[in-house]
């Protein structure tokens, strides 16, 4: 999956659909979730991954990777963002998402991108739907943590290591910090970057 973030969205959909199976970075959904709580749980699980790549919920693709389109009503990005704004996240850190529609072989596929973040783990202060406050839900392989469960201690440790840059080599960490110029502050004739 390395380098996938640099491809066009329609090319990403074609590649992931051709795999014919779900994975750590993507999930097929023939239709949008009827229950917003289930959709938000999927988003939180995809935000909590130890890798450094964006994740994708692909709507209009069946479980075997066939592009079939959608028959039922679709969700709007604004509605999803509003629902996330109503959740109570620890540290007020929310997943960043976007929703776009691509056309593959004359069939529309909605793509919900969950952008990679170093600010893991992301979890709730209060119960929501079947999700429990303080529980860390994540994507592991092609499965999400169960509603009433919690990620394993080893997986939670990886998420904290990701937050503190401990899963990268020192060079990767430094290059990563240099890329985010908006986080650099000027003081007199020098610049500094404080970890957030």
Residue ranges and their predicted role:
Residues 1-196:
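Conserved N-terminal catalytic/coupling substructures associated with nucleotide/phosphate chemistry
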């Amino acid at each position: 999956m390395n380098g996938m973030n640099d491809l066009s969205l329609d090319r990403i959909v074609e590649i992931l659909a051709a795999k014919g199976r779900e994975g750590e970075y993507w999930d097929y959904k023939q239709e949008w979730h009827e229950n917003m709580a289930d959709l938000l749980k999927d988003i939180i699980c995809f935000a909590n991954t130890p890798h450094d790549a964006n994740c994708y919920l692909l709507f209009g693709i069946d479980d075997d990777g066939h592009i079939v389109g959608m028959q039922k009503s679709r969700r709007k990005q604004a509605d999803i963002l509003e629902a996330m704004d109503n959740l109570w996240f620890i540290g007020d850190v929310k997943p960043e998402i976007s929703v776009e529609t691509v056309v593959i072989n004359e069939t529309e596929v909605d793509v919900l991108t969950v952008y990679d973040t170093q600010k893991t783990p992301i979890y709730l202060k209060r119960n929501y739907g079947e999700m429990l406050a303080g529980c860390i839900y994540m994507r592991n392989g092609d499965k999400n943590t169960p509603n009433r469960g919690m990620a394993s201690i080893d997986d939670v440790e990886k998420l904290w290591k990701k937050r503190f840059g401990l899963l990268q080599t020192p060079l990767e960490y430094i290059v990563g910090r240099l890329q985010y110029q908006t986080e650099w502050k000027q003081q007199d004739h020098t610049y500094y970057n404080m970890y957030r």
